[in-house]
Amino acid sequence: MTITGIIAEFNPFHNGHKYLLDQAEGLKIVAMSGNFMQRGEPAIVDKWTRAQMALENGADLVVELPFLVSVQAADFFGQGAVNILDRLGIDSLVFGTEEVRDYQKIADLYTEKGAEMEKFVENLPDSLSYPQKTQAMWKEFAGLDFSGNTPNHVLALAYAKAVAGRNIKLHPIQRQGAGYHSVNKDVDFASATALRQHQKDQDFLERFMPSVALFEQASKVIWEDYFPLLRYQILSNPDLTTIYQVNQEMAVRIKEAIKTAQSVEELVELVTTKRYTKARVRRLLTYILMQARENVLPEAIHVLGFTEKGRQHLKSLKGQVSLVSRIGKEPWDAMTQKADQIYQLGNPSIAEQNFGRVPIRIETN
């Protein structure tokens, strides 16, 4: 049987995600971000709600990406997620992309010339942002051009790099309907951005979300809910360079900007430069919110939920892979658990995220 991996955020889960799961074959394993997202923002609803949405709509097993994999630039995000899925025995990786290319060929190219390609990136001027450097590399070695608004294509290339040299086949699926950042309501498939923006419009949600009741009942948060706490973390920290990935230049810019910024959005605008993209600045602010430090990634994989098919697969992995299904006295990953506690501060009605929580079981599928 084919074992298909999917790397996702489901922020929130919508019909486009359901379409992706429907297109995937065999046993479907999802490696999903926890409560903080790749582009440096809190999830609109918590990880358990999103895992349940996925399991109700075709996923067989949902595992959690640790905080320091979730909140990373595309390459590290892809690498960390593929590592986890590889250990769970996937033989193919399915993903949505705006531009369906021969990603397998691209992965083979990276297998062959990876070292040379990375050297090329290192030698590019520092005035370029990391995404610009990566795009220059793909243009040079694979003749790829970027149309600009294609974040899923950028992630797809990160997955191609991550599977290089592994026995995993890549299966791109053409993205349906609205673009990633689109807030357009008049489409067949709405984007997660649009659903977050129109979260109070029930008709809209019902048109584009398969598990709409779950979403409506869940406690929701946005970045602004954490602004007072973020402000406190910035003002009370004498040296922001002790925080993961924060350099001197960014520390100075953030300290200066917080004096006048009235919101997270304003702070991001003030700190962003040509070299430091908004997504990168949001990630840095997320690290500051968490007081994140460089840390080793957990050995074990945290299971959020499964169907009967997924449970059988986990049984077959016993003894080969370290799995955590209940976080108790023994921590799974201190950094992720701390992030979960801080996530709960954004809305007092968010349920406890770790202690006493057991994987969601979906009986029928």
Curated annotation (Swiss-Prot):
Query: Record-annotated residues binding ATP?
Result: 7-20, 96, 152, 175
Q: Which domain of life is it from?
A: Bacteria
Write down the EC number.
6.3.4.-
Please give an example of a GO cellular component term from this record.
cytoplasm
One example of the protein's molecular function in GO is: tRNA binding
Keywords noted in UniProt: ATP-binding, Cytoplasm, Ligase, Nucleotide-binding, RNA-binding, tRNA processing, tRNA-binding
Any one Gene Ontology biological process term? tRNA modification
Cellular localization per UniProt: Cytoplasm
Enzyme class comes to ligase
* Gene3D superfamilies in the record: HUPs
Q: Which reactions is this enzyme annotated as catalysing?
A: cytidine(34) in elongator tRNA(Met) + acetate + ATP = N(4)-acetylcytidine(34) in elongator tRNA(Met) + AMP + diphosphate
Q: Which family does it belong to?
A: Belongs to the TmcAL family.
Question: What does this protein's UniProt record list under function?
Answer: Catalyzes the formation of N(4)-acetylcytidine (ac(4)C) at the wobble position of elongator tRNA(Met), using acetate and ATP as substrates. First activates an acetate ion to form acetyladenylate (Ac-AMP) and then transfers the acetyl group to tRNA to form ac(4)C34.
- Name of the featured protein: tRNA(Met) cytidine acetate ligase
Q: Record the organism.
A: Streptococcus pneumoniae (strain JJA)
Tell me what gene encodes this: tmcAL
